[in-house]
Amino acid sequence: MRPALAVVARLALAAAPSLGAADYTEQIRKGRKEIGEIVSMSIENSWVPAVTQSDDFQRPAKLELGALLKQFETREAVVGVVGLGYVGLPLSLCAQQAGFSVVGFDINPGLVEDLNASRSPLGHIPHEKIAQACKEGRLSATTDPDRLAMADAILICVPTPLGLHREPDLSFVEDTARMLAKVLRPGQLIVLESTTYPGTTDEVVRPMLEKASGLTVGIDFHLAFSPERIDPGNERYGMRNTPKVVGGITPACTEAAAAFYGQVCDTVVKAKSAREAEMAKLLENTYRHVNIALVNEMAIFCHELGIDLWDSIRCAATKPFGFQAFYPGPGVGGHCIPIDPNYLSYKVRAELKHPFRFVELAQEINSRMPGYVVDRAAELLNTDAKAMNGAKVLLLGVTYKNDIADQRESPARPIARKLLQRGALLSYHDPYVDGWQVDGKDIRRAQAPTEQADLTILLQAHSEYDLDAIAANAHLLLDTRGKISGDSVYPL
């Protein structure tokens, strides 16, 4: 059954022809108490006119948009965020800091409990930040989807991983759309932030919302796409000062999304539609993906040619135009670069019936790098008259990027797997990772990054690491990041 607040909203919709924007908003707000509580309320006949809503009834779009824009401007709007992970939690905090009341939804009860107890589930977000938001009374977390009915804007920040055959897995997005359709009410703004292929917002999310709710995009509610641009650990660019791209299903949807994000971000960029916004995100990540693959392949043949690629990049980067520096490494990791370009490749193959060769080649090269690292490790051990089987190998930094705890798609894991398969006695050190497993096997944690080993491999140059001390103490050091020089240091 639709929650009471949604019923209130539908009755207000029926009354809309005789109500002004302010009165319409007020009728909706009569169905609210404080944030976090949905109430059943009796509907007074004195304010509900004797009209019934027919299937072809349409409330003027200006009324809906005008009321919503005012709520955003005055910060009276309640914001709902679905998914409180690396994207949803920072977005929730940014909206709360902008003056909005935020209801965060997640299916993980432990995460919700942590947030409501002022504990941060993410290492790069301090507990104090969560505590302050909760203390101010404008941030709460829940596992109850009915509480999203009170939200004026609902932002979807759920994972979009790859399936077993590296095909797009939209199950989290689809589950969220089904859930929101049950609480969707007129006047709401729904925004998908999860990275996906062009057309998902219009072809997947829209029909699921419309069919189950009986409401229509652009008439009853707004639907848009706005790609997340979170860079965990980046202290220079955060949610506030990173430009926000928005694209709606209709122009009014774009305006509604732009109005909300304009209160949260310094700069809003309007795309022509949701499809252009979806493509913009994939373009950003595909650009990085193929350029990282370029320098990774160059690193392999530069080693064979005896050329210091890092020095070549340093020199090339002095050109003030037409060049952007990318650097080789042990592979690509994180929630974007290894995943997102595959969504675009899938879309091209599925609809146009031909491959996106740049992406597929880049994927092949970047996926090859962990194996190349292990081959270089074996080569270095051989020069020291040691076999990989039985050699003590220490991995430094197992997260996907420096100075954060995020291990998603980290190349450290496939590297470790290959080292174990060759018989290496493996240990690791990472200031952000207290315990680490590979295929269910616990890997011993070294007491210090300078612990003695037959071979030390630097995978992430965390700022906490004293790289000079590591170089001075290592018997053999394979530097996959080009950060260290020394007699016992060998580049990728």
Regions flagged by a language model, labelled:
Residues A16-L19, E26-K30, G99, G423:
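Generic alpha-helical structural signal
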Residues A6, A14, K33-G36, S485:
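General helical structural elements
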Residues V39-L492:
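Structural/interface elements that position substrates and couple domains in central-metabolism enzymes
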Residues L5, Y24-I28, S42:
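Coiled-coil-like amphipathic alpha-helices with heptad-repeat character
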Residues L5, L11-L13, L19:
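Leucine-biased recognition of intrinsically disordered, low-complexity hydrophobic segments
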Residues R10, D23-E37:
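Short, low-complexity, charge-dense intrinsically disordered segments
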